[in-house]
């Protein structure tokens, strides 16, 4: 399908006038001029062919960085993400070089095979989490922002009282308050929050993770959960194998001499020992969130518990079943990328609630599935 492009218009600029039709009775229409074949016409044709409309990711207002023609994105700071990659690759490389040959000879060949499978799965989940659009919602256009501001101002009852900047919607019998985002110029859909690091509104915002270099939201949460879960298995596997290697190697001498002979194994042991507890705790915490259909942001704020409210309220997004919540969080359909939607697909439509879930305005997600290209 042909890619849709758009042309950026600066805020406040007047839209280009539409072509006027010839009035009746004003004479015959002008005859088109035949283009000349001189050097000036060739230069104009080449310059017109070289000019193309800007893609949305090229003028993206957030703090993200894009690669491979907008297909990959990353947060503005990538140093912590690089540290994560270095720690995983270094520890696994040392394990394959200094521990796997001994364990494969004395125990079984399945140890390096299992380790390599876990390593490749961890790295693939990490890269998917880091380079995937987490669910960024496009900001309102100047016309949409002006129309919304006019609607908000008309709700004010007096001259000294500011107009309300919140809305209330009913979801599964529970009242949910929508807040207005002054940066994106729109009312945030339920479970949406504005990330101060990336400067974007992210749907089903969980948290901003510097270790993966990206926000964790609706579109990449399943990859993040698979990453921390597989990383906990890989760290525990390497930790157990290194202890087994050192134990078997120290049978012919003292354990201290064995540690002096294998400094690389000691380094792996230290890295795994200090990281395994936090990774296992994080995996258990997010397993509880997945089973409850909660986000880290909602759990910290106590949105559906008595941590914040005087009366305990139930989670309106929960399906009252652990299996149903896991399927909804990890296996649900993904919306199109907000950074790839073209402006011709953006047009207002009435907001509605459908089957207990919020349907965002069609200007966000009405891009056709086949035309959501980069």
Language-model segment annotations:
Residues 2-208, 212-374:
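Membrane-associated feature with strongest affinity for ZDHHC
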């Amino acid at each position: 399908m042909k890619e849709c492009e758009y042309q950026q218009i600066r805020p406040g600029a007047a839209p280009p006038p539409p072509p006027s039709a010839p009035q009746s009775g004003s004479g015959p229409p002008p005859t088109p001029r035949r283009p000349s074949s001189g050097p000036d016409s060739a230069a104009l044709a080449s310059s017109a062919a070289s000019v193309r409309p800007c893609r949305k990711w090229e003028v993206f207002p957030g703090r993200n960085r894009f690669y491979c023609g907008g297909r990959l994105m990353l947060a503005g700071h990538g140093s912590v993400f690089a540290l994560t990659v270095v720690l995983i690759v270094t520890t696994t490389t040392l394990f394959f070089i200094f521990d796997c040959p001994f364990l494969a000879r004395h125990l079984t060949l399945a140890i390096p095979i299992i380790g390599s499978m876990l390593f490749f799965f961890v790295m693939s989940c990490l890269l998917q989490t880091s380079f995937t659009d987490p669910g960024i919602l496009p900001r309102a256009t100047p016309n949409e922002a002006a129309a919304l501001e006019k609607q908000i101002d008309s709700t004010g009852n007096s001259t000294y009282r500011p107009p309300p900047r919140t809305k209330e919607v009913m979801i599964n019998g529970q009242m949910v308050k929508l807040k207005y985002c002054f940066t994106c110029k729109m009312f945030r859909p339920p479970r949406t929050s504005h990330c101060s690091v990336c400067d974007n509104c992210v749907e089903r915002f969980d948290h901003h993770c510097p270790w993966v270099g990206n926000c964790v939201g609706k579109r990449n949460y399943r990859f993040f959960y698979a990453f921390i879960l597989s990383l906990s298995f890989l760290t525990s596997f390497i930790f157990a194998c290194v202890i087994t290697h050192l134990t078997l190697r120290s049978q012919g001498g003292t354990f201290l001499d064995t540690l002096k002979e294998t400094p690389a194994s000691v380094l792996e042991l230290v890295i795994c020992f200090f990281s395994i507890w936090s990774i296992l705790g994080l995996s258990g915490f997010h397993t509880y969130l997945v089973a409850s259909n909660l986000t880290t942001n909602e759990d910290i704020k106590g949105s559906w518990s008595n941590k914040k409210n005087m009366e305990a309220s139930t989670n309106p997004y929960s399906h009252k079943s652990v299996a149903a919540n896991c399927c909804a969080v990890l296996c649900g359909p993904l919306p199109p990328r907000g950074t790839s939607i073209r402006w011709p697909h953006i047009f207002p439509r009435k907001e509605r609630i459908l089957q207990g879930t919020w349907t965002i305005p069609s200007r966000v997600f009405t891009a056709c599935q086949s035309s959501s290209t980069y």
